[in-house]
């Protein structure tokens, strides 16, 4: 018999609106002894069936909903989800010429805690919830059925798994170990991805649209690409005709890959048209400001500053300081392209932070364009938390 949870009276409202999370305070009774990640039936306080969910006894999000239908959570279930997700993305895959894209965006694709990125024929999984871990083999088997020649690699080396009572883990789940370099293509740009050792699942696929949109601001411009990682924005800047691009990052291996990517695309990087600078971005910006060095375009795509609500105030200060410094080194008429991937910081708050940075920088700034995550990272209407990446193009007078 399937274990069950009964909600506190009134707590069923969000479930009826199809939100996939049930918090611990919303559960009135647990029937049976569900194991970590096991599928349970969800009922109202008076016994009306609502959903199928994965139970996680150690997490504040006590249950994550798999389905609002009375169906088994098995290989066939995941096959259907993968087929729907692939179909949803077919247009953008063809439009942008993608050989690397997000196949599954967790809750937004109806699979809580499951993220799957595709790089050529390597499918990289992050399984961040107890339910995802419990159903790992079914997920792998479903991928193999949908994509028979696939290789499946796990990159569940993410600290959030501890909140679910899980250990961090990586490794081959099916097929071959990824090589050091898997080359993908997007919008005609070739990018080398290190699946095993790179950030996230290997690359920041969510910024693809922003990289493309950045091209219209860079022709014949001096560009500073901050937190450049393996050079994504810098590659598009070179493609867009930038006069010079400085890629700044604290990781020398990432910069080495950025240079390799520029060579892979046969961009002209002679005469210092492209520079790969190993530097702490905060210190570098202060040095440029103090030296009076200025740029036409500054691209600011920092790592996530806030992992929890407790870190949000500190993150706000960090975002304000770094954007203030960026504004101070822009030429009159210059452009700041700035982004935040912190889900806890919404677009309104981020816009206020940029406005505060403009005041502190003593610069007059206009918002001229807004950005969000790429089209293969959809946001379900019932799950606004799926909208996490936001950005602005700002003109400095």
Curated annotation (Swiss-Prot):
In the record, the note on similarity to other proteins reads:
Belongs to the methyltransferase superfamily. RlmI family.
- GO molecular function annotation: RNA binding; rRNA (cytosine) methyltransferase activity
Q: Which organism is it from?
A: Vibrio parahaemolyticus serotype O3:K6 (strain RIMD 2210633)
User: Can you tell which superkingdom this protein's organism belongs to?
Assistant: Bacteria
Which classification does the entry list for the species? Bacteria, Pseudomonadati, Pseudomonadota, Gammaproteobacteria, Vibrionales
Q: Which HAMAP family match?
A: 23SrRNA_methyltr_I
The keyword S-adenosyl-L-methionine is annotated on this UniProt entry: yes
Q: What is its EC number?
A: 2.1.1.191
* Record's GO cellular component terms: cytoplasm
Q: State the encoding gene.
A: rlmI
Protein name, as recorded: Ribosomal RNA large subunit methyltransferase I
Its localization reads: Cytoplasm
Q: Where does the protein principally reside? A: cytoplasm
Annotated signal sequence is: none
Function statement: Specifically methylates the cytosine at position 1962 (m5C1962) of 23S rRNA.
Q: Specify one Pfam family.
A: PUA_3
Q: Which reaction does it catalyse?
A: cytidine(1962) in 23S rRNA + S-adenosyl-L-methionine = 5-methylcytidine(1962) in 23S rRNA + S-adenosyl-L-homocysteine + H(+)
List residues of the PUA domain: 2-79
Q: Which UniProt keywords apply?
A: Cytoplasm, Methyltransferase, RNA-binding, rRNA processing, S-adenosyl-L-methionine, Transferase
Is ATP-binding one of the keywords? no
Which SMART domains has this protein been placed in?
PUA
